[in-house]
């Protein structure tokens, strides 16, 4: 009997891990997002709620058509998404994201930042604070996925995206970061 319980628990953990690898924003309800992604009973190894939220934030901005990064708006975005999901638990996460309008204080226009400048700053940040560099890259990854028209979150694609973006910035140093994020080719999960 104990063996059956252990097997059942193991299967649930593996299901959570595989679910966390790819998330369909159009079919995931707010209540499932809050219970299974942001506060799972058994967290998936390597899961990072901040990076997931950062990806969603970048995705939301990219989907809105804006071409700016809001440096001080992550907390406000997270609280607004949480409130929207609590008020509308059956709403899809994709629809909830469309309702959130980030605080637009201190916007950084991505059309005003050259790839070369971004790439050198990113490399410096990787040396001093890898975690922060990854968090910023997650925002850019979410933004770029939104620009492809996909509505799938797959955190395993971050390294491929980062390598493609950095290689393209090396090839096109004078291109602005917004144009590069729209043009970069990476293996985005397909709808």
Can you annotate each of these PLM segments?
Residues 23, 39-112, 118-191:
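Compact alpha-helical subdomains of small soluble proteins
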Residues 1-5:
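Positively charged n-region of N-terminal signal peptides that target proteins for export
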Residues 6-15:
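Bacterial N-terminal signal peptides
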Residues 16-20:
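Sec/Tat signal peptide C-region and signal peptidase I cleavage site
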């Amino acid at each position: 009997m104990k063996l059956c319980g252990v097997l059942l628990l193991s299967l649930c953990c593996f299901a959570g891990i595989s679910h966390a690898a790819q998330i369909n924003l159009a079919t995931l309800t707010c209540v499932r997002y809050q219970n299974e992604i942001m506060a799972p009973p058994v967290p998936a190894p390597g899961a990072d709620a901040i990076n997931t939220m950062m990806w969603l934030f970048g995705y939301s901005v990219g989907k809105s058509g804006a071409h700016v990064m809001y440096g001080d708006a992550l907390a406000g975005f997270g609280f607004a998404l949480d409130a929207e999901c609590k008020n509308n638990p059956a709403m899809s996460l994709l629809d909830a994201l469309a309702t959130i309008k980030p605080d637009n204080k201190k916007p950084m226009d991505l059309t005003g930042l050259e790839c070369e400048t971004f790439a050198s700053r990113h490399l410096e940040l990787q040396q001093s604070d890898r975690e922060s560099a990854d968090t910023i890259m997650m925002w850019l990854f979410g933004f770029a996925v939104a620009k492809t028209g996909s509505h799938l979150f797959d955190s395993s694609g971050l390294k491929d995206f980062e390598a493609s973006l950095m290689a393209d910035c090396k090839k096109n140093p004078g291109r602005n970061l917004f144009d590069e994020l729209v043009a970069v080719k990476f293996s985005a999960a397909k709808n």
